[in-house]
Amino acid sequence: MCLRVLDLRIPKVIITYCPKCRTHTEHSVTIYKHGKRRSLSEGERRYARKKKGYGSKRKPEQKRFAKVTKKTVLKLKCSKCGYIIHREGIRLKKAELVEVGGR
């Protein structure tokens, strides 16, 4: 298993399949960013309840190998219908969106 971490240049526009249009169309590419955490959501309240009180941590402390980077998720927006697809990428230190010339 190779644990090589990359820097990747991703084109701003790609042609790929749109499940809503059912054809291959141009998609604009952006990098997905997670939203703000809501402190009153059910999961957040459950987490706070479990964490409350004295004693140990909620989960055991990790002893061995931990991940160094997160997987980059790409948001592909169809230029025809505006449908957005999330596409999971690979582990990257840095993903850079670049303008591809040619046409």
Curated annotation (Swiss-Prot):
The note describing how and how many cofactors are bound reads: Binds 1 zinc ion per subunit.
Give start-end positions of each zinc finger (C4-type): 18-81
Q: What sections of the sequence does the record tag as coiled-coil?
A: none
Q: Which keywords fit this entry according to its UniProt record?
A: Metal-binding, Ribonucleoprotein, Ribosomal protein, RNA-binding, rRNA-binding, Zinc, Zinc-finger
Show the HAMAP family listed in the entry. Answer: Ribosomal_L44e
What does it do? Answer: Binds to the 23S rRNA.
Query: What family does the database annotate?
Result: Belongs to the eukaryotic ribosomal protein eL42 family.
Name assigned to this protein: Large ribosomal subunit protein eL42
